[in-house]
Regions:
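Extended alpha-helical targeting/anchoring segments
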Residues: 1-479
């Protein structure tokens, strides 16, 4: 296998005159298929960075049972997963993790800030078709949908360190000449400093529609309650999709969303034919060195805007028997998921209240030490998808979801984020997210249904989770 060796060339400047959004707006027309990743959590140095990736250099995708790899020299490799002897389940997990690991190992990067060079992209919820015996609907509506798994390696990365107030431009150079990438950095910096940036308008067209009516969704909730009462599952996360037509620039919608619903994971990925952007509060899986983390969110209530009312709502949420039972169940599921590749699994914090623009969430953190020979990609796959977006037990819950929901989920409930060449990774759950394609926005929300659930309450929870998205649509048009 060809080995692509690079050395980083970097330039660091003060960032007080720049913002990630402002820089991205200057670059996106010059460098197509770029990506912006931000975090609103600037309280400590570990979460205080934002990233812009430009110049796609290589990529790996899994789609319709085929692994597709593109390399810097223009080569494209395609191989059916069946060629690995893989159908579904453990064999397929191993085949996909091996493909990703082999792809990563074909790159060698040295130099300052090399830890930011890696794969940026997503794993859709539909990828469960490879990992378990889950029938995923492939309807006409989804024929132009994204690959099941898609990650890109960018040639140039811009890193904003909000803690130290710096902006670093990083370029990958092939030759031994330390000056070979300097003209490229000069061009990038020139684009960053471009004086005029014209923001474009955004206009929703018509009313927001859903693939399910309120009554149809409540009927699905009642079916889930019956499955819980029969003992088929303890919990099912059932969802519904919404569609909004629009004209104009969807990046303005991202700007509106990030302004009203700042979250640990803010992202805008342009993949050419479609874009994924959102404001996710939830870490699915993070690996730093030899430690792995899952941060389950289970338990949600609406914010009123009144501090005293919100305090009472948070206290009620913390003590509500139904919400607590659900939270305990999903923390245990996270512990079990990590235990497949980790030892010393423990709960770092439990039932922490986190306040967002429209909702209050109940959050815990579970961590573990990776086993000595653990495969980091396999560890991620073994935790996928999040129990908070599927249910418990996971496999049976996903089978019921596939039966009840009228379409496949696409990226909703999957993951988006970074896989480092050194094995570190950081993946957010794709919630509070828009998929934009051909003048249409798709967005989705759900709720965790247990035996004691009430269909009206679960419908309200689903609508509460949509609050930030629907408000962002209105603000993007007005401002």
């Amino acid at each position: 296998m060809a080995k692509f060796s690079y050395k980083t060339v970097t330039r660091k400047i003060l960032a007080d005159l720049y913002t990630p959004v402002g820089v991205y707006m200057r670059l996106r027309d010059i460098y197509p298929q770029s990506a912006l990743m931000e975090s609103s959590d600037y309280h400590g140095s570990e979460n205080s960075r934002s990233f812009i990736g430009v110049h796609p250099l290589a990529s790996i995708a899994v789609s319709h049972g085929e692994v597709i790899k593109t390399y810097p020299d223009g080569r494209v490799e395609k191989e059916q997963l069946s060629a690995f002897g893989a159908g579904q389940g453990e064999e397929c997990k191993l085949a996909i993790s091996k493909s990703i690991n082999d792809f990563i190992s074909s790159f060698h990067v040295e130099g300052e800030s090399k830890e930011f060079c890696g794969l940026y992209g997503f794993t859709t919820f539909n990828a469960v078709r490879y990992f378990e015996n889950i029938p995923v609907k492939d309807t006409t509506m989804e024929k132009n949908d994204a690959p099941d798994i898609y990650y890109i390696m960018y040639k140039d990365i811009i890193v904003f360190d909000h803690f130290n107030n710096t902006m670093e431009l990083i370029a990958l150079q092939e030759s031994e000449d330390p000056h070979s990438s300097l003209p490229e950095l000069d061009e990038l910096l020139k684009a960053v400093n471009k004086a005029n940036v014209k923001p474009y308008d955004f206009h929703p067209v018509g009313e927001t529609t859903s693939t399910l009516t309120d009554e149809e969704h409540k009927a699905n909730i009642r079916r889930c309650i019956q499955h819980c009462l029969r003992g088929d599952v303890f919990q099912i996360v059932v969802s519904r999709r919404f569609v909004q037509k629009y004209e104009g620039d969807d990046f303005k919608l991202y700007r509106a969303l990030r302004s009203i619903n700042p979250s640990p994971y803010l992202f805008y990925f342009d993949f050419g034919g479609f874009r994924i952007f959102g404001s996710s509060p939830e870490t699915h899986n993070r690996i730093v060195g030899n430690k792995a983390f899952i941060d389950p969110i289970a338990g949600t209530t609406r914010r009123t805007g009144d501090m005293e009312q919100d305090r009472k709502a948070a206290e009620f949420l913390r003590n509500d028997p139904k919400e607590n039972a659900e939270h305990v169940m999903l923390v245990d599921l996270a512990r079990n998921d990590l235990s497949r590749n980790c030892h010393g699994v423990k709960v770092d914090f439990y039932k922490d209240m986190q306040f967002y623009s429209h909702v209050i969430h109940l959050v815990s953190r579970v961590s573990g030490e990776l086993d000595e020979h653990a495969d980091h990609i396999k560890e991620f796959i073994d935790t996928f998808p999040a129990g908070t977006l599927s249910g418990a037990p996971k496999v049976r819950a996903m089978q019921i979801i596939s039966e009840l929901e009228p379409h496949n989920r696409g990226t909703y409930g999957g993951c988006i984020g970074f896989i480092g060449l050194n094995g570190d990774l950081n993946q957010a759950i794709v919630i509070r997210t828009f998929i934009s394609r051909n003048g249409e926005l798709w967005f989705q929300a759900g709720s965790g249904v247990v035996a004691k659930s009430n269909d009206e309450y679960e419908l309200e929870e689903c609508n509460n989770k949509l609050g930030a998205l629907t408000k962002a649509i209105h603000i993007a048009e007005e401002l």
